[in-house]
């Protein structure tokens, strides 16, 4: 099987940030949460907040929007940002593993692309994390939880934080924009 990271790997950008800006343009009153979001980020940078708590502060706005409708509109407009090199080589057995929230990626990954998704589990009604952020070693744990006997043929990511998954793959690739290079020194 082939495994791909999502943001900056097969998607041109950060889907969470793009979604936030998309929502903010349509619901400008949500700017009221910006101080909380900035505070959460600063507390994370100083080691006071966990990554999960910082992201909960960021996603506080989802409680105040029609989430399904907004994600649907967002992906109608933004699925064009899925990179063409991925669409050309996509296989039904692919797995997308991402730190982005499941509520955001599910419709585009499972619906539009028709492949499996492992993502950060977030309660869509509260913005609270269910378990750990799907990042680094947690991606490996979540992969083996869902697919205990999987063999990774090819792995693609834009980030060295995905080295734990890259080490498990027969072939690993670093993606920079549309340039795909063999992952060295794993």
Where are these regions (language model features)?
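Short low-complexity stretches enriched in small and charged residues
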Residues: 13-17, 48-55, 71-77, 109
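Active-site neighborhood of HAD-like aspartate-dependent phosphohydrolases
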Residues: 1-46
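Generic structural signal for well-ordered secondary structure
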Residues: 12-13, 51, 98, 136
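Short, compositionally biased "basic patch" segments
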Residues: 34-60, 112, 116-117
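Short, flexible segments with low predicted structural confidence
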Residues: 25, 29, 57-59, 114-115, ...
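Active-site-proximal helix-loop elements at catalytic-domain edges
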Residues: 67
């Amino acid at each position: 099987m082939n495994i791909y990271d999502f943001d900056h790997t097969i998607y041109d950008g950060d889907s969470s940030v793009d979604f936030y800006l998309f929502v903010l343009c349509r619901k400008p009153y949500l700017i009221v949460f910006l101080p909380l979001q900035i505070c959460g980020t600063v507390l994370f940078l100083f080691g006071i907040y966990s990554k999960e708590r910082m992201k909960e502060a960021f996603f506080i706005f989802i409680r105040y929007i029609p989430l399904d409708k907004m994600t649907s509109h967002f992906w109608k407009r933004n699925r064009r940002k899925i990179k063409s090199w991925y669409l050309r080589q996509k296989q039904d057995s692919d797995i997308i593993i991402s730190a982005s929230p499941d509520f955001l990626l599910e419709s585009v990954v499972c619906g539009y692309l028709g492949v499996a998704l492992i993502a950060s589990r977030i309660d869509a009604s509260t913005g609270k994390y269910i378990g750990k952020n799907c990042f680094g070693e947690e991606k490996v744990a979540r992969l083996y939880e869902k697919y205990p006997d999987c063999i990774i043929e090819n792995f693609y990511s834009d980030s060295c934080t995905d080295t734990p998954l890259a080490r498990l793959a027969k072939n690993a690739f670093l993606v920079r924009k549309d340039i795909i290079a063999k992952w060295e020194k794993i």
